């Protein structure tokens, strides 16, 4: 699935690790910029604190009562962080940064396998330096841990899908990712990975896709992963008097899928239809500043101009089912769509690593320029909003937050200058990432 060899800089494992570490440090520096302001941050942090205080690592609790909202993996990790750093906001958020760093490195490995090392490198930078991941990578939320586990399974499948014969190695990594994703956020991880595997296998040519026996092996490994999850879930449900099943699965999984909860989503069928495409603007804002690449990427992937068929199929099988699943769910929150972001980042990386194709195809060049001007307009509006916050709220914003948003403006301008000068999308993308860092 790799593209043909290219001349010029080809980032390796060392460069990818250094970039992942740099973004991780950047996210850690952002953490003290604000107190725990999201309601979920306070819930999760308190549940982790109570685990430490009570020694009950089986059943999460909040204010002494069963807290059946989510499985325990993130609470376990937060509790470990509290034991090292003390009970404070930084400790509550700490786990998210390295988890996001792991996601970035795995995205590089996936992009390297599907397209080229430079495509993978741009993809990891695009993922790590978009608005949504900057927020979730510096917040006491569960999403960064979930994303890392999803990316682990996706990377293992990318290697197997590309013909790697080390089935038991990558099959084991696939199962570990599935198990961790379930311990992080229940069935969300498998709901992303299973369609990715199914569609990219079914629609691949029979001569190039993994053998059917390997698919049976992955199914058995997934059952083992489910068994690992049940090894926690069954005792926890018994200890909670059935609350983990009734509330955790019945309300917070099945209930959220079919009914808008806590005002997150439209009420009634009219409200449901009105909110159906809410994730389109969420992606446009959340993937900023890399939304500049999406019009050209979607056009290039749809027309078969970027990457080979296997690579495009892999990305489509990740992006489309994930987007459709969260779109159809009744309850909608912006961070729910995060599992689709690595696929978007892979598209961005593939575009940035294919300057010859983009500049040769007038339609792709047009869409890239369109994305740029939308990017500039949104950047200016965002910077204006950030600068206006002190006047509107009466509170000063932390310097890391202000610097991060200011850097986005410089980054967008740096990228477009390189594109307009036809100096190469890869060089421009690196200028953007450097300015943002």
Task: Give the positions of each predicted feature.
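Start-transfer (signal-anchor) and selected internal transmembrane alpha helices
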Residues: 1-27, 217-224
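Transmembrane-helix signature of polytopic, membrane-embedded enzymes
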Residues: 13-19, 107-129
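Extracytosolic helix-loop segments that constitute the early lumenal/periplasmic catalytic or substrate-binding loops
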Residues: 25-26, 43-66, 73, 80, ...
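Transmembrane-lumen/periplasm boundary regions of multi-pass, lipid-linked membrane glycan transferases
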Residues: 46-49, 176, 180, 189-335, ...
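Transmembrane-helix motifs of polytopic, lipid-linked glycan transferases
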Residues: 94-114, 152
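Specific aromatic-rich, kink-prone transmembrane helix
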Residues: 106, 145-163, 344-347
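Membrane-interface transmembrane helices that cradle and orient dolichyl/undecaprenyl
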Residues: 118, 153-173, 181, 352-355
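Short acidic/glycine- and proline-prone juxtamembrane loop motifs at membrane-interface regions
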Residues: 138-146
């Amino acid at each position: 699935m790799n593209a043909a060899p290219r001349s010029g800089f080809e980032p390796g494992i060392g460069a990818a690790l250094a970039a992942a570490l740099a973004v991780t440090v950047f996210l850690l520096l952002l953490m003290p910029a604000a107190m725990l302001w999201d309601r979920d941050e306070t819930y999760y942090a308190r549940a982790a604190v109570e685990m430490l205080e009570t020694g009950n690592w089986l059943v999460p609790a909040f204010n002494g009562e069963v807290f059946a909202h989510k499985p325990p993996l993130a609470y376990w990790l937060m509790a470990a962080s509290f034991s090292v750093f003390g009970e404070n906001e930084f400790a509550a958020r700490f786990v998210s940064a390295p988890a996001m760093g792991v996601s970035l490195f795995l995205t590089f490995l996936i992009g390297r396998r599907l397209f080229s090392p430079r495509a993978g490198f741009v993809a990891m930078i695009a993922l790590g330096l978009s608005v949504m991941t900057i927020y979730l990578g510096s917040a006491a939320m569960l999403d960064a841990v979930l994303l890392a586990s999803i990316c682990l399974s996706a990377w293992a499948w990318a290697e197997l899908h590309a013909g790697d014969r080390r089935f038991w190695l990558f099959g084991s990594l696939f199962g570990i990712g599935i198990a961790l994703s379930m311990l992080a956020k229940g069935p969300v991880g498998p709901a992303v990975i299973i369609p990715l595997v199914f569609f990219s296998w079914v629609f691949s040519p029979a001569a190039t896709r993994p053998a059917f026996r390997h698919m049976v092996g992955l199914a058995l490994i997934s059952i083992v992963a489910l068994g690992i999850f049940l090894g926690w879930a069954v005792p926890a449900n018994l200890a909670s008097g059935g609350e983990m099943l009734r509330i955790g699965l019945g309300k917070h999984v099945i209930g959220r899928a079919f009914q808008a909860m806590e005002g997150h989503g439209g009420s009634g069928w009219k409200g449901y239809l009105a909110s159906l495409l809410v994730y389109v603007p969420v992606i446009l804002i959340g993937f900023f500043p890399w939304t500049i690449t999406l019009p050209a990427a979607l056009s290039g992937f749809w027309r078969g101009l970027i990457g080979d068929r296997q690579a495009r199929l892999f990305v489509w099988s990740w992006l489309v089912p994930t987007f459709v699943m969260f779109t159809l769910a009744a309850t909608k929150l912006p961070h729910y769509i995060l599992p689709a972001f690595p696929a978007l980042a892979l598209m961005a990386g593939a575009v940035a690593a294919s300057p010859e194709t983009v500049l040769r195809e007038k339609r792709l060049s047009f869409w890239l320029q369109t994305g740029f001007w939308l990017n500039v307009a949104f950047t200016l509006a965002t910077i204006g909003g950030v600068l206006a916050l002190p006047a509107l709220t009466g509170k000063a914003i932390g310097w890391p937050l202000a610097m991060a948003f200011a850097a986005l403006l410089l980054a967008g301008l740096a990228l477009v200058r390189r594109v307009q000068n036809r100096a190469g999308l890869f060089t421009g993308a690196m200028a953007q990432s450097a300015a943002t860092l």
